Amino acid sequence: MYDADEDMQYDEDDDEITPDLWQEACWIVISSYFDEKGLVRQQLDSFDEFIQMSVQRIVEDAPPIDLQAEAQHASGEVEEPPRYLLKFEQIYLSKPTHWERDGAPSPMMPNEARLRNLTYSAPLYVDITKTVIKEGEEQLQTQHQKTFIGKIPIMLRSTYCLLNGLTDRDLCELNECPLDPGGYFIINGSEKVLIAQEKMATNTVYVFAKKDSKYAYTGECRSCLENSSRPTSTIWVSMLARGGQGAKKSAIGQRIVATLPYIKQEVPIIIVFRALGFVSDRDILEHIIYDFEDPEMMEMVKPSLDEAFVIQEQNVALNFIGSRGAKPGVTKEKRIKYAKEVLQKEMLPHVGVSDFCETKKAYFLGYMVHRLLLAALGRRELDDRDHYGNKRLDLAGPLLAFLFRGMFKNLLKEVRIYAQKFIDRGKDFNLELAIKTRIISDGLKYSLATGNWGDQKKAHQARAGVSQVLNRLTFASTLSHLRRLNSPIGRDGKLAKPRQLHNTLWGMVCPAETPEGHAVGLVKNLALMAYISVGSQPSPILEFLEEWSMENLEEISPAAIADATKIFVNGCWVGIHKDPEQLMNTLRKLRRQMDIIVSEVSMIRDIREREIRIYTDAGRICRPLLIVEKQKLLLKKRHIDQLKEREYNNYSWQDLVASGVVEYIDTLEEETVMLAMTPDDLQEKEVAYCSTYTHCEIHPSMILGVCASIIPFPDHNQSPRNTYQSAMGKQAMGVYITNFHVRMDTLAHVLYYPQKPLVTTRSMEYLRFRELPAGINSIVAIASYTGYNQEDSVIMNRSAVDRGFFRSVFYRSYKEQESKKGFDQEEVFEKPTRETCQGMRHAIYEKLDDDGLIAPGVRVSGDDVIIGKTVTLPENEDELESTNRRYTKRDCSTFLRTSETGIVDQVMVTLNQEGYKFCKIRVRSVRIPQIGDKFASRHGQKGTCGIQYRQEDMPFTCEGITPDIIINPHAIPSRMTIGHLIECLQGKVSANKGEIGDATPFNDAVNVQKISNLLSDYGYHLRGNEVLYNGFTGRKITSQIFIGPTYYQRLKHMVDDKIHSRARGPIQILNRQPMEGRSRDGGLRFGEMERDCQIAHGAAQFLRERLFEASDPYQVHVCNLCGIMAIANTRTHTYECRGCRNKTQISLVRMPYACKLLFQELMSMSIAPRMMSV
């Protein structure tokens, strides 16, 4: 890589990076990371892995379809019918394509898919080999090449997307935003993102203590074959509690039992060993207790040995297990066969499912028991369910693979059924017709569209909310949504443990960004530099270990295990090694050279427990760290210099990893490294804190996620405030994407004059917050002025608002399509006329053009018609003279929302997937800040606008500066958002200095004292206070006031969208009470608590009015004799109660309609409520 003379320029000492140099150097390293990876790389890589590896693997793993007709006994001699074998082989994926109605394929661009409500998917083809075997003839092989089997939705910006690798200019020509990160799908025109799902890691042994159950301790192993369709099979090894109901009068002591898959009862552990073929006690103990010099442990196993004393042979043990199976066999042979199957295929499948894996399984089972005993003896800590090393994240790849596997299985089933029909009739079948392509296409589309992850027919078992509509409110909310993690624990559970911030989340998951309320701590977000492993094959590592003198389990004597180190690969025990130190060094060296071992593999050496664990599986969360050797960074100046020139010399992050100065460390391995926070810690001091550092953080601010990285000085705020801002930053208005004018989003807010903040963090440049900001630098004073800013409200400058301060535009799209309901009902876009059209509302239809659509530029207000559409009324058979019907059509137009007004911005007419006419109309309205709108600073300080004063009524400084916003001093002390104040100071300095201020967290170079000194250099008060003059009187305000520029955001909650009142309006059909909700012009509920207040006041008439007259007044006629509602004909004034034959003694009772309904419903249940009139 370097020439000899190039090396000469750097001396050994010269090349070291000093702490001062590091202030800038670390950001060069971080920039190179983001240049290469971007922010959604984990989504894209996972999807690419699915397309390139998983699909092919799933197709190859499927067994060939073997078909044969029933033998025909027609002509005396039995002729063996031909056998057909179908094998699916190589797969091919084409570019995303769309077939028009005329059948011509054309490449589909993502924006076209969004606008026309199509699915952005690519066709999948497969080679099928069909073999015909006839008796006495040689085999006939036919190749069906590239048979279409379905469409797979494509993730935007992944390798197979049409946008992959295009320049910014090309993207703009395709109406795509160059800043859009991709990482989502387009299904029926809406953008869907797959949320990473958390799960416990498979194939690892966990030991937990059990509370209040018959077991004291339980060891479990969720065992699952890599890349197989089998569901995980879990095996539990448990130790019974002392003197519990399980221990037989506790004479025997604590027994150990195993719970096997498909076996109903628990089986004593020793019997399982005997069933595996280890009969003598010594053999079994050797596999459990490696060291016989351990009396305590021997004592623990003794009760289990005594219990299984009765059963001494393998077959007896197998019979014992088989007879407890799900459906026990009739004969002994069948039972034994069943037990053998369970032990071979279902117990610990990851160790092996082929024959002769008994030794390995016995060792693994023994290891599980050993772990259980260690925990029971208190020699090893129990496992932690919430440790992030024990968790795996299922991203798009594994999630889609799970779905595709199920769909493909169904496809094969259908092919088999179809082909068998033809073969039974003695005909050949057509493969193209046998393959139902809709199974895969619709199956994947259904799950991505609804978020129910699984088969459509079993929707109730499926996980909900795996796929969500991508949040497009602000650019930051989009990025954050693409990096979200979800724990599938019931939201209603009151468990605090899984919700708490675990130590192992440091650097992997953002500590601040999590929703408030019932999902707190269950929904998390990735930290900025965290990456999720894609998974790689363990085979090269296994081969390497074989060469490097690892002893295989089958070849060793059990006695050797006690002193050696066990080696696990992906949770499976593969062997032992005598020299772990050297092995680990070699493995690490290989990983750093990226030779044999991929950089995302993690290697953990647990010295205390004498174990080496190697993980290559997918879904481990890891992050890059700098490698330290001999207390010096391996990263040198020359690397930094090359990175600075990376645009010209192609030296990138990948080269940095390849040259072995950075490596990826996952959560488990992080616990075995010694981490320096800054290179400053590596300096030799008099009192060294530690002299064995192995790694160093790149920059501590990288522990934060997307939304928390926007906060200036988050290390000066009380922690919940950062959490609040992380949630509010997702609701701020800005420019959410640069191509918003060509998109037809259902809802969109765009700020008129967004500004980049004066005070920024260094992380912001990777979030593109400077290019797509969401807020304005406002002059903010902290004062109580006229008292219109109490309780978190703010006073705004009316004149600034008139000049465009925080003005925004709001877009809403309406869509409608013509579709054919039946053969005689068809929908048409047209302008309905009152002569021929039934059911027209009292609305203005005049604004429509003749084609039924409104023209752009027309001003519309609530309940105006935007899209005119009619549907033909079906002709009734009984009408003979149907020619002179008055109405032939029914109106089913689309109206503007009642509470909105605006101007039609854009009208789009096109054809949708079925070839029907389809239109989208976008209406825009200008939103000017007004009293009641919500604003917030970047520190969780939210407030609504309390009043707006003209500029001349606002206070002013001697320089003539008036604040845009005045907030109340009471907002600061109890909330301790000191970052807010420092930001204001820093902003003041920046405005004077003319350069952007740095507010990156954990940065010792910036502190309040330094900022204050700079401020006083510019002739201001040290702490930012100024003398203000009252705007009403012009007099000096007695106290000095803190004033300066602070970045404020306008949030999406606006008073226009929420204002609601009702006098009269629609009522519900069932109980005749007012409807609910603003959109339906509903009433306001007078609830139980309000009722109680009125009772306490004794306001009886008011109570009657609210709960009766203003709600659902009704009157019924009641028979005075039996108290049940009577028949009343109010026109003829005749009343009767048939049961009592009473026509005279009837009273009129007024009651709420809901009460009458309740009485009648009770009557339908044979309960007769009688209303006796007094």
Swiss-Prot record:
What's the record's note on cofactor binding? Answer: Two Mg(2+) ions are coordinated by both the catalytic residues and the nucleic acid substrate to enhance substrate recognition and catalytic efficiency.
Q: Which residues bind Zn(2+)?
A: C1119, C1122, C1137, C1140
Gene behind this chain?
A: Polr2b
Q: Which residues carry this modification: N6-methyllysine?
A: K1052
Report the protein name in the record: DNA-directed RNA polymerase II subunit RPB2
EC assignment: the record states 2.7.7.6, 3.1.13.-, 2.7.7.48
Taxonomic path: Eukaryota, Metazoa, Chordata, Craniata, Vertebrata
- Give the highest taxon in the source lineage: Eukaryota
Which reaction(s) does its UniProt entry say it catalyses? RNA(n) + a ribonucleoside 5'-triphosphate = RNA(n+1) + diphosphate; a 3'-end ribonucleotidyl-ribonucleotide-RNA + H2O = a 3'-end ribonucleotide-RNA + a ribonucleoside 5'-phosphate + H(+)
Instruction: Recall the GO molecular function terms of this protein's record.
Output: chromatin binding; DNA binding; DNA-directed RNA polymerase activity; hydrolase activity; ribonucleoside binding; RNA-directed RNA polymerase activity; zinc ion binding
Where, per UniProt, does this protein localize?
Answer: Nucleus
Activity regulation here? Pol II enzymatic activities are inhibited by alpha-amanitin. 3'->5' exonuclease activity is stimulated by TFIIS, whereas pyrophosphorolysis is enhanced by TFIIF.
Q: What InterPro entries does this protein map onto?
A: DNA-dir_RNA_pol_su2, DNA-dir_RNAP_su2_dom, DNA-dir_RNAP_su2_hyb_sf, RNA_pol_bsu_CS, RNA_pol_bsu_protrusion, RNA_pol_Rpb2_2, RNA_pol_Rpb2_2_sf, RNA_pol_Rpb2_3
Residues bound to Mg(2+) are: D792
Q: Which Gene3D superfamilies match?
A: 2.40.50.150, 3.90.1070.20, 3.90.1100.10, DNA-directed RNA polymerase, subunit 2, domain 6 (2.40.270.10), RNA polymerase alpha subunit dimerisation domain (3.90.1800.10), RNA polymerase Rpb2, domain 2 (3.90.1110.10)
